[in-house]
């Protein structure tokens, strides 16, 4: 038992020294991006990096919680009021996006007239090639986007 304790102490000491060396060499520590319950209750929109803009004829609030180092993948929280957005085969959705609806709902009507209702607690993944119409009275959602060339995240 004593040997195990000594081995753990030695291992922990080596790990601490290695971490300290990385820190001294300017290696950036990368952390996961957490969105807390408090954030989701609205405090996230008080962050200094929150972007407020007019989009689709309504006021929107958007906070990016993570941007990948290559600029092609991101996640965040988005709030929008009532609006309608239309996408065509010639000008489709443009990004691969996963959405989790925290509040509100939206209706997705695809180009073939297939209708999907996405409400509180539902999730949907919209492919970049999607064509159709989004109708909503407003929502709060968590989003994750992949954009092959990064242009959809600008």
Predicted feature locations:
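A short, N-terminal "cap"/entry segment at the start of jelly-roll beta-barrel domains
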Residues: 18-74
């Amino acid at each position: 038992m004593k040997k195990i304790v000594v081995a753990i102490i030695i291992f922990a000491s080596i790990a601490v020294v290695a971490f300290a060396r990385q820190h001294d060499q300017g290696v950036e520590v990368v952390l996961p991006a957490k969105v807390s319950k408090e954030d989701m209750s609205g405090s996230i929109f008080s962050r200094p990096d929150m972007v407020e803009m007019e989009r689709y004829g309504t006021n929107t609030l958007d906070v990016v919680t993570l941007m990948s180092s290559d600029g092609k993948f991101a996640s965040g929280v988005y709030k929008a009021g009532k609006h309608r957005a239309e996408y065509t085969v010639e000008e489709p959705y443009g990004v691969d996006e996963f959405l989790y609806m925290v509040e509100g709902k939206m209706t997705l009507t695809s180009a073939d007239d297939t209708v999907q209702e996405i409400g509180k607690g539902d999730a949907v993944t919209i492919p970049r090639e999607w064509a159709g119409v989004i109708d909503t009275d407003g929502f709060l959602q968590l989003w994750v986007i992949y954009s092959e060339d990064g242009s959809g995240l600008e």
